[in-house]
Swiss-Prot record:
Main location: cytoplasm
Alphabetical UniProt keywords: ATP-binding, Coenzyme A biosynthesis, Cytoplasm, Kinase, Metal-binding, Nucleotide-binding, Potassium, Transferase
Enzyme class of the recorded protein, top EC level: transferase
Gene3D superfamilies: 3.30.420.40
SUPFAM superfamilies, per database record: Actin-like ATPase domain
CC cofactor: NH4(+); K(+)
Name of the protein this chain belongs to: Type III pantothenate kinase
Intracellular or extracellular location(s): Cytoplasm
Positions bound to ATP: D6, V7, G8, N9, T10, H11, T12, V13, T137
UniProt-recorded Gene Ontology molecular function terms: ATP binding; metal ion binding; pantothenate kinase activity
Family: Belongs to the type III pantothenate kinase family.
Length: 265
């Protein structure tokens, strides 16, 4: 089986593939302070929950693919693969890795690995032109051209960042539960804040995607818009421009990149 690990700033998502199928997945908090040994213990606990894997770390795993937006965690995971997984082939997404997606940026090395991986999956699953909206710590909008190139994107504050900012900077406001409000017009402070977050972000998505699509394609209707990320369900159904929801887009992209590189490792 292939173990895929997507390390984000707030959460880390792990997926276990049997061929092209995700047979298990986990979401844990990202902690840049964890050592390789601590990560190995954590992985062993998670892997031990699956009936097709053995009790020893690495049993049943025949490949590993990792991308990370946190350099220190990537370093420790590299140590995990070296010390605990032995000869299991591992692909870590870094500059120079073969993705099959040309990056049309002033400095390609600046683009987050997860954003490129999302583009890889978008091209494979839907073709171009496409826009990937990833609802994570930041909300990112990534454009894929009709030729399958990474054409650039937009970075905006994420939903959780906005909620925290309201609670910290608003003298009479507080941190609230992320939930859908009963209506757009809130009848109390919590509902008003929830409405601002949910419908505000839905409006942001519609506005940004509409403008990007006009630049990306001669006919904006040709652009497929894919939503992913842990907080995507908060906005689905309210943002009118979203065509597809693929919660495992990054993990699928990691599988594809692994398959394109393993013969070279």
């Amino acid at each position: 089986m292939l173990l895929t690990i997507d390390v984000g700033n707030t959460h880390t998502v792990l997926g276990l593939f049997d061929g092209e199928d995700i047979v298990e997945h986990w979401r844990i908090s990202t902690d840049a302070r964890r050592t390789a040994d601590e990560l190995a213990v954590l992985l062993q606990g998670l892997m031990g929950m699956h009936p097709l894997l053995g009790e020893e770390l690495g049993d049943g795993i025949d490949g590993i693919a990792i991308c990370s937006t946190v350099p220190s965690v990537l370093h420790e995971l590299r140590e995990v693969t070296r010390r605990y997984y032995g000869d299991v082939p591992a692909v870590l997404v870094e500059p120079g890795i073969k993705t099959g997606v040309p990056i049309l940026m002033d400095n390609p090395k600046e683009v987050g690995a997860d954003r490129i991986i999302n583009a890889v999956a978008a091209v494979e699953l839907y073709g171009g032109p496409a826009i990937v909206v990833d609802f994570g710590t930041a909300t990112t909008f990534d454009a894929v051209s009709a030729r399958g190139e990474y054409a650039g994107g937009v970075i905006a504050p994420g939903i959780e960042i906005s909620v925290e900012a309201l609670g910290v900077r608003g003298a009479q406001l507080r941190k609230i539960e992320l939930a859908r409000p009963r209506a757009v017009i809130g009848k109390n402070t919590v509902e008003a804040m929830q409405a601002g977050i949910v419908y505000g972000f839905a409006g942001q998505v519609d506005g940004v995607v509409t403008r990007m699509a006009r630049e990306l394609a001669d006919d904006p209707d040709d652009v497929t818009v894919i939503a992913t990320g842990g907080l995507a369900p908060m906005v689905l159904g309210e943002a009118s421009v979203i065509d597809e929801h693929e919660p495992w887009l990054t993990l699928i992209g990691l599988r594809l990149v692994y398959e394109r590189n393993i013969s070279r490792t």
